[in-house]
């Protein structure tokens, strides 16, 4: 049997788990940039494909039965370009790290951490302190937190927010009972009723037809003017033009954006995440889609991927199956 690890993240995964794979499994690694000379034969021979992308213009892969993503999303894998019956599995283990990020930026924003630290470092200013009876900053306690997408990540965000004495609401595409500390889980179609109540909105939902452009200009206008928006879902969940206008014009107070509308490629390895200059806005925390990229997450994900490949080789039931084509 043969497994093809395709792309930079997959190559790193292969290095991390190779010693845990069956000796009879042949492993081929094609790192970035993809070697188009080696790819046709590698694709033709592989029963397992480990990658976060596969395109229709790639060579045929007639024997592939398992597509193991190295990420949570499989939207860059064109399953229609693979054999019928293929199982597509994702990799998780990122929930706790991403939830920590959400709580971190929520606290940093409410406590004006970056602004106050920079001012004190650069100017030695005490104007935000009790020493000069300065203007106090906020706190998370007593605020209303709205979580859009009450799945693995959303539930972890809620669990971490409970000790801060927030009022917690959520919205989800499918019915789900609230865990302790969560006041209500709205159907996603009722999100318009939730947004005006929230001081903080965290987007954790998967990207799909129902959620593409979910947060548009109209829904941004429903949010409170002092609201803070955190996107740890996918860039396309928010209308790019609408959120830039809302932040530029301060119709909402601020945002933390970890996911984007465009990503680096071979031609532009340091490509900005948007056609708009979000990085120039002082009310936006920007990070390069790394909220879940922790050492602990990498190890957890490697364990899951190795386990799934071993299950496949042994003919056992797979884990984290998200699609069958």
Where are these regions (language model features)?
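Short glycine-/small-residue-rich Rossmann-like dinucleotide-binding loops
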Residues: 54, 71-72, 199, 205-207, ...
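N-terminal glycine-/charge-rich "phosphate-binding" loop or analogous flexible N-terminal tail
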Residues: 1-48
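Rossmann-fold NAD(P) dinucleotide-binding segment
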Residues: 55-62, 79, 210-229
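Structural alpha-helical scaffold elements that stabilize or flank donor/cofactor-binding regions
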Residues: 39-42, 57-60, 193-197, 219, ...
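Rossmann-like dinucleotide/phosphate-binding beta-alpha-beta segment
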Residues: 133-225
């Amino acid at each position: 049997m043969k497994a093809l690890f395709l792309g930079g993240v997959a190559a790193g995964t292969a290095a991390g788990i190779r010693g845990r794979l069956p000796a009879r499994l042949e492993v081929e690694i094609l790192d970035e940039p993809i070697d188009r000379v080696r790819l046709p034969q590698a694709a033709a021979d592989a029963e397992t494909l480990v990658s976060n992308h596969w395109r229709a213009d790639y060579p045929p892969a007639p024997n592939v039965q398992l597509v193991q993503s190295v990420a949570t999303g499989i939207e860059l894998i064109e399953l229609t370009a693979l054999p019928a019956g293929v199982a597509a599995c994702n990799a998780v283990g990122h929930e706790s790290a991403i939830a920590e990020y959400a709580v971190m930026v929520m606290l940093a924003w409410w406590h004006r951490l970056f602004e106050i630290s920079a001012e004190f470092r650069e100017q030695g200013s005490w104007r935000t302190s009790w020493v000069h009876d300065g203007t106090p900053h906020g706190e998370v306690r007593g605020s209303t937190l709205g979580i859009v997408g009450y799945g693995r990540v959303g539930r972890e965000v809620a669990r971490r927010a409970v000790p801060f004495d927030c009022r917690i609401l959520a919205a989800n595409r499918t019915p789900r009972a609230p865990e302790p500390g969560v006041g209500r889980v709205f159907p996603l179609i009722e999100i318009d009723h939730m947004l005006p109540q929230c001081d903080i909105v965290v987007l954790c939902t998967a990207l799909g037809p129902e959620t593409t452009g979910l947060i548009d200009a109209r829904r941004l206008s429903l949010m409170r003017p002092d609201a803070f928006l955190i996107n740890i879902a996918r860039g396309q969940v928010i209308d790019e033009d609408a959120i830039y206008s809302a932040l530029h014009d301060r119709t909402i107070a601020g945002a933390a954006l970890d996911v984007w509308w465009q990503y680096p490629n071979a031609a532009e390895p340091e490509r900005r995440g948007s056609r708009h200059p979000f990085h120039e806005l002082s009310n936006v925390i920007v990070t390069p889609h790394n909220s879940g990229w922790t050492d602990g997450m990498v190890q957890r994900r490697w364990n899951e991927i190795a386990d799934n490949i071993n299950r496949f080789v042994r003919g056992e039931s797979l884990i984290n199956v998200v699609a069958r084509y």
